[in-house]
Amino acid sequence: VGSEMCIRDSLPAGAQLYQPGEVLDYRASYKAKFFPNTEVGSVRVTTVEEEYEGEPMYRIVAHGKTLPAFRWVMNVDDKYTILVDREELKTRRFESDIREGNYRFWSNYVYDWPEMTVHTRWQGRRMVRDTTKTMSLTPRSMDPVSLYFHLRSIDPATLQEGKTEVLEMLLEDTIRHLRYRFLGRETKKIRSMGTFRTLKFACQIGTSEGYSFTDGTEFTVWISDDKNLIPLYIESPVRIGSVQAYISGYHGLKYPLSSKIK
């Protein structure tokens, strides 16, 4: 009972933002010193209601792919899916299907919240058979898609500039720490979309043993400063240059996008 209460207390305060019919479109771009900022990919995040094994669920799918003009360089077609219990608002399943050039990878996580465990299964292109592992959960353990929605659940009234929070990101056979820090409010211009009031966060990913940060694991997120709390812009450095993802379209939002200034 205590663990269930703890789980409920840790649930996203704005978890009602699992909004059926919501569609968020993003464009991904790359830029470097001698390489202009160029759009190379797209991502669509959708939320629908469905029944799974007789239970009401939200199905959230994030589907990213390379734009046609760049598929000859690297043909990316990645899909991530979560099923969320509509009553308890806890993720029940996570699946990934990653196709990047000749690389293939598949994974599946099944959450057992009463036992506070997660059963993971994964297989790569060169693996003869899939691999499995069972790991312990805490109320702060989440897969990457669930983390995306957790950031949307933050209550802006409780934010303190410089304050750090730590979550746990599940990755097949390990759990990595995700540390995020509120940097303050900022007006952000988004290409072809306009200017928005945003909440700015710095995020870092470490190992399960601690914060052993390497190049590319630190990134910045700008979230709309309104009731929708949409990630509007993400920027991450890479070895040469940086990659960005920014909102390019939306519909089916639960609330007006009041953060848009012009």
Where are these regions (language model features)?
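Structural motif
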Residues: E4, E88, E115-T117
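Short, small-residue-biased leader/transition segments that mark boundaries at the very start
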Residues: V1-I7
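Active-site/ligand-binding surface loops and adjacent short beta/alpha elements
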Residues: W113-L171
